[in-house]
């Protein structure tokens, strides 16, 4: 069996440009992470934990490591990181860790869709923060998650393996919507797409504070 860990790439809201006052976070949205054989999950988790300890020691050399401490990917891989001594050490440590994924029989996963450029009014004809805009953002998230699941199922089928999927914790209303949509997508596609039988359940959600592998998916995303 394969185990997949994924996290969101960017955010699903509107995007205008990187220098726009409000809509400047990300021109794409999707999911990224890694897939690894079940028998290598524990070993790789220990390697991720060690890398996280290394990150902590780079940034807080005089302090004791805190197991629930997180190093967010957005902070880790930021502009100019390689030009700073601590940032360079982190990037090189992350590179060394990710090289161990294929060595463990796993694969990196990355899927994004480019957003239509414009404010919510320009793209959807709705005001920022309005119910219509929130609904559009939720729909973008659900469609991208469904496509990520489709692609992970295809990968699992190519490997002749079943798969389980884990992602970072989100709020309860979002979780319920995503689980319901994921089940609907999986079962609706099964008749014509046999690879969908490879995924045994809809995604499960784990807090990245508690799961080293979910933390690693965040670094990749």
Regions found by a protein language model. Give the residues of each.
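Phosphate-ester processing/binding pockets and catalytic centers
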Residues: 1-221
């Amino acid at each position: 069996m394969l185990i997949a860990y994924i996290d969101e790439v960017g955010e699903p809201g509107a995007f205008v440009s990187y220098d726009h006052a409000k809509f400047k976070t990300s021109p794409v949205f999707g999911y990224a992470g890694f897939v690894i054989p079940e028998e290598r999950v524990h070993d790789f988790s220990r390697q991720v934990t060690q890398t996280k300890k290394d990150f902590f020691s780079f940034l807080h050399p005089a302090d004791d490591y805190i197991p629930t401490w997180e190093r967010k990917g957005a902070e880790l891989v930021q502009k100019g990181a390689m030009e700073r001594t601590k940032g360079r050490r982190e990037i090189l440590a992350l590179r060394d860790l990710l090289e161990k994924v294929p060595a463990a029989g796993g694969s990196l996963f990355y899927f994004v869709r480019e957003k239509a450029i414009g404010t919510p009014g320009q793209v959807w004809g709705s005001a920022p923060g309005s119910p219509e805009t929130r609904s559009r953002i939720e729909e973008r998230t659900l469609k991208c998650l469904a496509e990520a699941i489709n692609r992970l199922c295809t990968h699992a089928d190519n490997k002749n393996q079943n798969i389980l999927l884990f992602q970072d914790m989100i709020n309860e209303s979002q979780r319920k919507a995503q689980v319901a949509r994921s089940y609907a997508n999986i079962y609706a596609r099964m008749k014509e797409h046999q690879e969908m039988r490879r995924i045994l359940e809809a995604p499960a959600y784990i807090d990245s504070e508690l799961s080293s592998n979910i933390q690693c998916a965040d670094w990749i995303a």
